[in-house]
UniProtKB/Swiss-Prot annotation:
It comes from Ehrlichia chaffeensis (strain ATCC CRL-10679 / Arkansas). Keywords: Ribonucleoprotein, Ribosomal protein. GO terms for molecular function: structural constituent of ribosome. It comes from the Bacteria. This is Small ribosomal subunit protein bS16. The gene is rpsP. PROSITE patterns: RIBOSOMAL_S16.
Length: 87
């Protein structure tokens, strides 16, 4: 079983809202997930405190046990939007 940390889409039409979830890679994008780690709201400016909110300790745990982050989650970490060094 390959586990991925990815975004699951929620919200209304033209008003997307995403949850950061840990899910089996074979499950549909918005399907069943193992754990919800936080959320991402692209409708807010990047400076807003609720643009991205993630449980960093759980994110670090899942990365340590071999879960793979998708491109978008990796980009958030690389750009410092999700700061995994603080926890």
């Amino acid at each position: 079983m390959s586990v991925k940390i990815r975004l699951a889409r929620f919200g209304a039409k033209k008003r997307p809202f995403y949850r950061v979830v840990v899910a089996d890679s074979r499950v549909a994008r918005d399907g069943k997930f193992i754990e919800s780690l936080g959320f991402y709201n692209p409708m807010l400016p990047k400076e807003h405190e609720l643009f991205v909110k993630v449980k960093v300790d759980r994110l670090k745990y899942w990365l340590s046990v071999g879960a793979q982050a998708t491109d978008r989650i990796s980009w958030f970490i690389k750009k410092g939007i999700i700061n995994i060094e603080t926890a």
